Curated annotation (Swiss-Prot):
Pfam families: Transferrin (PF00405)
Binding site for Fe(3+) 1: D72, Y102, Y200, H256
Stretch forming the signal peptide: 1-16
GO CC annotations on file: early endosome; extracellular space; plasma membrane; recycling endosome
Protein known as: Serotransferrin
Alphabetical GO biological process terms: antibacterial humoral response; iron ion transport
Cysteine disulfide links: C26-C48, C125-C206, C170-C184, C234-C248, C343-C379, C353-C370, C404-C678, C419-C639, C451-C526, C475-C667, C485-C499, C496-C509, C566-C580
One example GO MF annotation: metal ion binding
Length: 685
């Protein structure tokens, strides 16, 4: 999370194009407007904008007529669509833990004699159409369990199907089924307080008043003094007490969050600062205004700022998105695509992937769709969200992928002789390379210039910086070296000062092949071309890029001109990497989603039988790239081997490596925004 930056709220910086001095909060009811007006009186930085519904507020925020509103997960999904282009910036936190999730539950009165499997023909109370606990999760659950049968909107609108499933309902916001409004007592046409049975307290009141048989709410909705009169309906068709929600829920879902316009970091920061600076006003109490959950949920204990560049898909996570998308079927395809969606980073990888796709289609008709990502983290997000299926990454990126719910499926093997041995070790050594005679040692590295493969990568960052952190206990790595090239760092920092960009000197410090000094060969080139005093790479990289080997830029370099250094040893010959290295680490691995792991393994085994090093087909080689670059896979890869299905990322990386990473992750600068989000929002995994 971003720490609170205590900047003054008064006045405007000269660099700001348009002065932001007010947070215009959108409200959807008279009671909410009362609370907002009271907030504005206590903190004049706020003003209130009244609209008739949530969707009207989204339109107002997009147009700049309002700035912010707190939404539930289903509404966050809608807000993030192209129609509105809003994103979550602040999450509600409930209770004393750091958990920003809640449980969607089905509540019924005691002794009413039915379970979740017998809901057909019952009367239902919903918080609102499109809301998480009241609609998306319960309806998605009943669809997935095949109790509600729906072929998609080409057949019939979902609201019509749900209206036919239940005897009658109150589902505020329903427009396509009169039956879904039959139990309501106000204006059911809008998701707003104009309907008394709207939202959590309203849906529960609908049940309490005897209008409905079941209410779909969150786990904290039933008041403490009334819990003994109600029970939860579990997915296994049993019932449990209200307090046993962790063992009897429909789903764990992301908390409500404040949304605003995308691509306006300054506005997002101003909203956060404004909320953080509120004094003598309880943001999380609605009782004085005669309502419940006004502006924020009453059960909120604090607010948490989300990492920068988080969009609605990252915040909601793949499991919740799957539930929402299941409710929005427009066309039912007759068959599911068997294409493998491979994610490629940058133009060079995309070109190789396109060649692979053509070769595969010609060979046996297997379709490969090449999905382009800007960075590895961008590709990991695409895999999480089912926009891509797989990619090969280094160990540090396996760690991030694992934190985000992905699994390692296959690993690169660099020894041809071990390709027939399934349990063989797939390892390489992380080393520190210097120019011979430079006088650089491990002990005098401070204030030298450094070349790294990329932020978050194994040999180029995690291992060396982990060792440096163990020595210094200081996370300010940009101050340890005088200047560096560490692709993926802040382009304006000293960690990017030695980077060069591409041939046109653009994309400087980008974590892709568009940065000349990116990855193993790039970090060595940074050293060889005099941009750095030390390069952190893998043990084979010097031999692969000297003595006439490697791309054109490397032809004139000689391996004898370079040496290795390591703690308490060196300089030594580059041949002596086994006795002078920083660590022995796992090879690169292919990561994917758990549910398609077997599909990915089968696909890759088939592909390497056609295009691997030992295959006779010459039109395309999976592990070969122009000029010895590591495109899609490392150039030194001889084959891919399956990782046992029981091994998750922790088991694959090993305890020693996990310990190093835990230590390094003390430094937030070494943790990407993606990893911060994945470890922060545990609803995703």
């Amino acid at each position: 999370m971003k720490p609170l930056l205590l900047l003054p709220l008064l006045g405007c910086l000269a660099t700001i194009a348009s002065c932001i001095d007010t947070v215009k909060w959108c409200v959807t009811s008279t009671k909410e407007n009362l609370k907002c007006t009271a907030l504005a009186a206590a903190a004049p930085v706020f003003s209130c904008v009244a609209r008739a519904s949530i969707t009207d507020c989204l339109t107002a925020i997009k147009a700049g007529e309002a700035d912010a509103i707190t939404l539930d997960g289903g509404e966050i999904y809608t807000a993030g669509l192209d129609e509105y282009k809003l994103h979550p910036i602040i999450a509600e936190q409930y209770g004393t833990s750091t958990d920003t999730c809640y449980y969607a539950v089905a509540v019924a009165k005691k002794n009413t004699g039915f379970g979740l499997h017998q809901l057909m023909g019952k009367k239902s109370c919903h918080t609102g159409v499109g809301k998480s606990a009241g609609w998306n999760i319960p309806i998605g659950t009943l669809l997935s369990m095949d109790f509600i049968k729906w072929k998609g909107s080409d057949d019939k609108k979902l609201e019509e199907v749900v209206g036919e499933f239940f005897h009658s309902s109150c589902a505020p916001g329903a427009t396509d089924s009169a039956n879904l409004c039959k139990l309501c007592i106000g204006d059911c046409s809008k998701s707003s307080e104009t309907e008394p049975y709207y939202n959590y307290h309203g849906a529960f009141q609908c049940l309490k008043d005897g209008k409905g048989d079941v209410a779909f709410v969150k786990h904290l909705t039933v008041p403490e003094e009334e819990k003994n009169d109600y029970e939860l309906l579990c997915k296994d068709n049993t019932r449990k007490p209200i307090d046993q929600f962790e063992n009897c829920d429909l789903a764990k879902v992301p908390s409500h969050a404040v949304v605003t316009r995308k691509d306006n970091e300054e506005l997002a920061q101003f909203i956060w600062q404004s909320l953080s600076s509120v004094k003598n006003f309880n943001l999380f109490s609605s009782t004085p205004y005669g309502g419940k959950n006004l502006m924020f949920k009453d059960s909120t204990t604090t607010l948490v700022q989300l990492p920068l560049n988080v969009d609605h898909t990252m915040y909601l996570g793949p499991h919740y998105l799957e539930s929402v998308k299941a409710l929005k079927i427009v066309n039912i395809p007759s068959t599911t695509s068997d294409a493998m969606k491979w994610c490629a980073v940058g133009r060079s990888e995309s070109d190789k992937c396109d060649s692979w796709s053509v070769a595969s289609l010609v060979q046996d008709g297997t379709t490969i769709d090449c999905i382009k990502g800007n960075t590895v983290d961008d590709c990991l997000k695409k895999i999480m969200h089912k926009e891509a299926d797989a990619m090969a990454v280094d160990g540090g990126q396996v760690y991030t992928a694992g934190k985000c719910g992905l699994v390692p499926a296959m690993v690169e093997q660099y020894d041809q002789g071990q390709c027939s041995a399934p349990g063989a070790a797939r390892l390489y050594y992380a080393v520190a390379v210097i120019k011979k005679g430079s006088g650089v040692t491990w002990e005098n590295l401070r204030n030298k210039r450094s070349c790294h493969t990329g932020i978050g990568r194994n040999a180029g960052w995690n291992i060396p910086m982990g060792l440096i952190y163990e020595q210094t206990k200081n996370c300010n790595f940009s101050a340890f070296f005088s200047s560096s090239c560490a692709p993926g760092a802040d382009p304006s920092s000293q960690l990017c000062a030695q980077c060069a960009g591409n041939a046109e000197s653009i994309n400087k410090c980008k974590a892709s092949n568009e940065e000349r000094y990116y990855a193993y060969a790039g970090a060595f080139r940074c050293l060889a071309e005099g941009k750095g005093d030390v390069a952190f790479v893998k043990h084979s990289i010097v031999k692969e890029n000297t003595d006439g080997q490697g791309p054109e830029w490397a032809k004139a370099f000689l391996s004898n001109d370079y040496e290795l250094i390591c703690p308490s040893k060196g300089p030594v010959s580059v041949e002596n990497f086994m006795s002078c290295n920083l660590a022995k680490v796992n090879a690169h691995a292919v990561v994917t989603r758990p549910e398609i792991r077997t599909k990915v393994v089968t696909f890759l085994n088939n592909q390497q039988s056609h295009f691997g090093n030992s295959a006779s087909e010459e039109s395309f080689k999976m592990f070969t790239s122009p000029d010895g670059e590591n495109l899609l896979f490392k150039y030194s890869t001889k084959c891919l081997q399956e990782i046992p299905a029981h091994l998750d990322y922790k088991g694959f990386l090993g305890q020693e490596y996990m310990t190093v990473m835990s230590s390094l992750r003390t430094c937030k600068e070494s943790t990407s925004d993606l990893e911060q989000l994945c470890t922060y929002n545990m609803c995703q995994t």
